[in-house]
Swiss-Prot record:
The name this protein goes by in its record: Uroporphyrinogen decarboxylase
Organism: Chloroflexus aurantiacus (strain ATCC 29366 / DSM 635 / J-10-fl)
Chain residues that bind substrate: 23-27, 72, 148, 203, 321
Gene: hemE
InterPro entries, per database record: UROD/MetE-like_sf, Uroporphyrinogen_deCO2ase_HemE, Uroporphyrinogen_deCOase
Pfam families according to UniProt: URO-D (PF01208)
Family stated for the protein in its record: Belongs to the uroporphyrinogen decarboxylase family.
Residues annotated as signal peptide: none
Length: 355
């Protein structure tokens, strides 16, 4: 059953819980490090043959139930005119950040089929090698992309982003509308290139209060999902939405319109599922640090998550964030094998949904 992941996204019965892992292709793998010695990070992302090879590494090494394209959330911003580099020890840097309404007004229109064509080519290459195993495309969400564009890189306080929201609301919503259109176009292009599902990463949205998420973000994320569904109709593949520290935003997140909602490790899976509603599938939610623990602890934590899911159709096992750089490869393999061998209960539990 090579479609377990897609069936779980649609809350259909499966013979076992599917598993894939965010950042499953990464520095913890020696195969990845060997390639990284020869290429810069952006060079890897922008070279379709290399991105395809890296995408396939964890599929070949661990037998995960889905591949996710090797890419990054920020390169689509280059099409708008933002200048992006990755600095050693510093991460991504945007050299002309957005700081004024004028900066928003001069952003270019772009077609991701041209500006991010390398990722679409990589998707096509990977698709040919998967023999029916699902392939996941992805993008950053409008809020997270806006935050990077305004902060000029990573941030802990999001001070510039929040000030821009509060002080320049018209320019903020203009920016978010532009990014919503960009992300919709990009994800549709990925689907047309072969993606069987798409994930929207809202890595920083957990920094917002529910009131601010409703006022400044929700409608733009909804518009993104609605645009994909309107343009693709009945052939729209599963849409996954993921962010960290989102437990306080459950009432808002359940309104986005995604098929699958990602859950991080800061909340029990059954509690999150009840809050999100059982009309959604859920994905998660092992703490990535658990993979540094002995196998007995990995098994105990994974078993707890699987028992909380209880065999209810619609659970995809994943981490609550990406795999960390120094993670032992054998522990990743152990986790995948444990989840794939864990028997589903005969009947799903009766859980009370939070209204």
């Amino acid at each position: 059953m090579r479609d377990r992941f897609l069936r779980a996204c649609r809350r259909q019965p499966v013979d076992r819980t599917p598993i894939w892992l965010m950042r499953q292709a990464g520095r913890y793998m020696p195969e990845y490090r060997a390639i990284r010695e020869r290429y810069g990070f952006l060079q890897m992302v922008k070279t379709p043959e290399v991105a395809a090879e890296v995408t396939l590494q964890p599929v070949q090494a661990f037998g995960v139930d889905a591949a996710i394209i090797f890419a990054d959330i920020l390169p689509p911003l280059e099409g708008l005119g933002l200048q992006l580099t990755y600095e050693k020890g510093e991460g991504p840097v945007i050299h002309n950040p957005i700081r004024s309404p004028h900066d928003v007004s001069v952003l270019r229109s772009c077609d991701p089929r041209e500006t991010v064509a390398y990722t679409l080519a990589a998707l096509q290459l990977v698709k040919r090698e998967l023999n029916g195993l699902p392939l996941i495309g992805f993008s950053g969400a409008p809020f997270t992309l806006a935050s990077y564009a305004i902060e000029g890189g990573g941030s802990r306080e999001y001070r510039l982003t929040k000030r821009f929201m509060y002080e320049q609301p018209a320019a903020w919503h203009d920016l978010m509308e532009r990014l919503s259109r960009l992300v919709a176009d990009y994800l549709i292009a990925q689907i047309e290139a072969g993606a069987d599902a798409v994930q929207i990463f809202d890595s920083w949205a957990g920094a917002l209060s529910p009131a601010d998420y409703r006022a400044y973000v929700l409608r733009h994320t909804q518009a993104l999902v609605q645009t994909i569904r309107a343009r693709l109709g009945d052939v729209t593949p599963p849409i996954i939405y993921f962010g960290t520290d989102m437990a306080g935003l459950a009432g808002e997140v359940r309104q986005i319109g995604a098929d699958v909602l990602g859950v991080d490790w800061r909340i029990d899976l059954d509690v999150a599922w009840a809050q999100y509603g059982f009309n959604h599938a859920v994905q998660g939610n092992l703490d990535p640090m658990t993979l540094f623990a002995p196998p007995s602890i990995i098994a105990a934590r994974a078993r707890d998550i699987l028992e909380r899911a209880g065999g209810r159709p619609g659970h995809i096992f994943n981490l609550g964030h990406g795999i960390l750089t120094e993670t032992p490869v054998d522990h990743v393999r152990y986790l995948v094998e444990f989840v794939q061998s864990y028997p589903l209960p005969a009947t799903a539990p009766v859980l009370q949904e939070v209204v």
